[in-house]
């Protein structure tokens, strides 16, 4: 049986991750730590012999620059890349820019956990006049009004990510291409829920660490066989726990 591998990687720590702020579609860059995480991810992949034929990422620079860091370490900076808004982070609506711990102090840990991790729960909406509304950003000029979010749940994020997976990414994998995807916590959670057929309760507890390669292996029918992170297991567990704790009051 031939095994097809796919590598998913959440962007390295961003400036707003470092400040513990809701980011969503806000286009913040990587922190110094995030740049280092991207390079380290590339080094881990190189040490394990990974080579890629094609890459996907979002239209947000924290994911794009993570991919650059990885590919630079692999000496594959030339690799063809497709950028899509469908791989963007979940849109956090009116929470974007707010400190997560301060928001938890105001609304309670459980409410913020539901906003962050609940499957069908949307954060408070933006108005379309708000400067944070993506309709004001030229990179989304080709999107229809219906495609421009004022807030998103994970369920709504899945609604845009999985068609892109089925129509664009999966056909390349079926043709034998080796794929890496640099994306975001919730766009990756959307793919993981779909690939592993997780329940709404299971996905609530899933936290994706920053800057750590997540490998999926598929059988001949493109069904997932197993998945695993590359790197030090204790460090990865600590990173995932840190993500979970971001939304708690101090």
Swiss-Prot record:
Keywords of the record: Gluconeogenesis, Glycolysis, Isomerase
Entry binding sites for substrate: 10-17, 23-24, 62, 89-92, 100, 116-117, 185-186
Keyword Magnesium: no
GO BP of this protein: gluconeogenesis; glycolytic process
Molecular function via GO: phosphoglycerate mutase activity
Record InterPro entries: His_Pase_superF_clade-1, His_PPase_superfam, PG/BPGM_mutase_AS, Phosphogly_mut1
Active site: 11 (tele-phosphohistidine intermediate), 89 (proton donor/acceptor)
Domain of life from the UniProt record: Bacteria
E.C. number(s) listed in UniProt: 5.4.2.11
Coiled coil: none
Sites annotated Transition state stabilizer: 184
Gene3D superfamilies the UniProt entry points to: Phosphoglycerate mutase-like
Reactions that this protein is recorded to catalyse: (2R)-2-phosphoglycerate = (2R)-3-phosphoglycerate
SUPFAM superfamilies hit by this protein: Phosphoglycerate mutase-like
PROSITE patterns for the chain: PG_MUTASE
Pathway as given in its UniProt record: Carbohydrate degradation; glycolysis; pyruvate from D-glyceraldehyde 3-phosphate: step 3/5
Known role: Catalyzes the interconversion of 2-phosphoglycerate and 3-phosphoglycerate.
Classification via PANTHER family: PHOSPHOGLYCERATE MUTASE
NCBIfam families associated with the record: pgm_1 (TIGR01258), PRK14115.1 (NF010713)
Subunit structure: Homodimer.
Protein name (record): 2,3-bisphosphoglycerate-dependent phosphoglycerate mutase
This protein's encoding gene: gpmA
């Amino acid at each position: 049986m031939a095994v097809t591998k796919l590598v998913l990687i959440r962007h390295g720590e961003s400036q707003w991750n470092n400040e513990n702020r809701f980011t969503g579609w806000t286009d913040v860059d990587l922190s110094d730590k995030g740049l280092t995480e991207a390079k380290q991810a590339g080094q881990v992949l190189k040490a394990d012999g990974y080579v890629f034929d094609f890459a996907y990422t979002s239209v947000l620079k924290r994911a794009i620059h993570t991919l650059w860091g990885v590919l630079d370490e692999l000496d594959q900076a030339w690799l063809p890349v497709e950028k899509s808004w469908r791989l963007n982070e979940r849109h956090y609506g009116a929470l974007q820019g707010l400190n997560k711990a301060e928001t938890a102090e105001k609304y309670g840990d459980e409410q913020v956990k539901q906003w962050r991790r609940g499957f069908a729960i949307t954060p408070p909406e933006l108005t379309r006049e708000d400067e944070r509304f993506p309709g004001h950003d030229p990179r989304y000029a080709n999107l229809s009004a219906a495609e421009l979010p004022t807030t998103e749940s994970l369920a709504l994020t899945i609604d845009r990510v999985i068609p892109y997976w089925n129509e664009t990414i999966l056909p390349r994998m079926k043709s034998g291409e080796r794929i890496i995807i640099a994306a975001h916590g919730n766009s990756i959670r959307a793919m993981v829920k779909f690939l592993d057929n997780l329940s709404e309760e299971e996905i609530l507890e899933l936290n994706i660490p920053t800057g750590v390669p997540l490998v999926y292996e598929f059988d001949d029918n493109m069904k997932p066989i197993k998945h695993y992170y590359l790197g030090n297991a204790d460090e990865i567990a600590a990173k995932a726990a840190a993500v979970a704790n971001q939304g708690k009051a101090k």
